[in-house]
Amino acid sequence: MLFFVIMGCVSANDLSTLGENTTVPNIIIVGDAPEVPDVPDIPDIPDFPVDPDNPDIDDQNDSDTVNLTIFNIDEYFVDGTLGVEHSNTKFVLTQNFDNLGLLKIEANNVTILGNNFTLQNVAFLINGKDVTLANFTLVNDFDFKDADGAAILTLANNTHIRDCVINYTVPRDSEGYGISAVGRRIAPISGLEVINCIINFEGHNYKANTYNYALKVSNCPNALIANNSIYTQLPLRDVNFGAVGADLNSNYVASVGIEYSNNLTFIGNIVASIVNKRPGSPFPTLDG
């Protein structure tokens, strides 16, 4: 099976004819793609992470199952934090949730199964390993500064984000990311998977030197980013070249930004970008 990545990239070497609020609709027209040799098939993905020494999924996920409601969620996310005492637990959403703010996951081996419910103005900061977020919708128009502005920020190994929808309108001139996975050069993140997700991301960092990315992956070797649809509306911004050239931090806007992530698989994804503003700068760019 052969997949193609569709990515939008808009740049301007001479954009004098563009107006202040120029919009570029449907910027991608795809014709017949050339043959690409040796493109691997997406590997079969289990519903939940599987311990290779114990592949029985049911045995791994039925030790503790909690149905979350508005009446009991504070018993587990105490002051917004799921502590390590709740490791090895599967949480099942039973309704929509609003305005919970930033939820921090410190516990390990946790699954949050959404059952297609919606979380409005809720963000996740993942510090525990082996965490799965699956099958819910996030609708945000608030910048979560304690999560670097991300709707989902993971700093831990083996984070699995599957079948989620993220609709994020970042407040004007604020930092924001749909999904952000950030390791360090001396401590990279392993086991990251983002699969079958839809990200609708709208950024408005017209003037401030803040970052707006739908997806950011840094220091995550061997990550799997597969079968996602990423749609962005972003302004054109100048690339901030440093003394030795440009890197990811040189771009204030991007649909997808990936760095220092060797052997990452990016396959079967659709990425489409629309320009929502052209500030007065000499060489504005929007990277796909």
Where are these regions (language model features)?
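Low-complexity, acidic Ser/Thr/Pro-rich repeat tracts that form intrinsically disordered stalk/linker regions
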Residues: N13-E75
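Secretory targeting signatures
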Residues: M1-V24, L93
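Tyrosine-centered aromatic motifs in long, intrinsically disordered, low-complexity repeat arrays
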Residues: V39-I42, C164, F201
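N-terminal extracellular ligand-recognition/capping segment immediately after the signal peptide
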Residues: F71-L82, H86-V110, N116-V122, T137-L138
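Extracellular beta-strand solenoid repeats
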Residues: V92, D98, K104, T111-L113, ...
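Extracellular beta-strand/beta-solenoid scaffold signature
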Residues: N99-L102, Q120-L125, F142-L153, P171-A187, ...
